[in-house]
Regions:
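A charged, well-structured terminal subsegment
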Residues: 113-121
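Amphipathic alpha-helical interaction surfaces in cytosolic regulatory modules
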Residues: 31-109
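Conserved catalytic submotifs in the C-terminal HATPase_c
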Residues: 20-21, 60, 116
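Glycine-centered tight turns that cap/initiate beta-strands
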Residues: 22, 105-108, 114
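STAS-typified acidic loop motif
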Residues: 2-42
Length: 121
């Protein structure tokens, strides 16, 4: 079952949030940098009464990410695990995957080649 909750389109970054079988899927398109980090952070912040946050971030549409994006993902991971939930990354483009691996983010946050694999865990 899939429900679309919201869409955020501020400038070069667009974010859509859906729910697939009880898992929040945040689909991101564009560039994640210092100008868009706050928008991404807001999209990844779980509702206070949302229970265990289970989130997959679909990065297939992200063409660029700098350290600002890495920091947002780390904060979202810490928030999710602190609430007995989890965060997974899905379908990063090669340039984003290179950064994720370079900084070791894939050793902290599970990174899957497809959205379907991330949903299955």
């Amino acid at each position: 079952m899939k429900d679309t909750d919201e869409a955020v389109r501020p400038g070069p970054l667009s974010i859509r949030t859906d729910c697939v079988d009880g898992i929040r899927v945040v689909t991101v398109h564009g560039e994640i940098d210092h100008t868009s980090r706050d928008t991404l952070h807001r999209a990844l912040t779980p509702a206070p009464d949302g229970g265990r946050p289970r989130t997959v971030i679909d990065l297939g549409g992200v063409s660029f990410m700098d350290s600002s994006g890495v920091n947002v993902l780390i904060a979202a991971h810490q928030s999710a695990t602190g609430a007995d939930g989890w965060l997974r990354l899905a379908d990063p483009q090669e340039s984003v995957l290179r950064l994720v691996r370079l900084v070791g983010l894939d050793t902290v946050i599970p990174c899957h080649p497809t959205l379907q694999q991330a949903l299955r865990g």
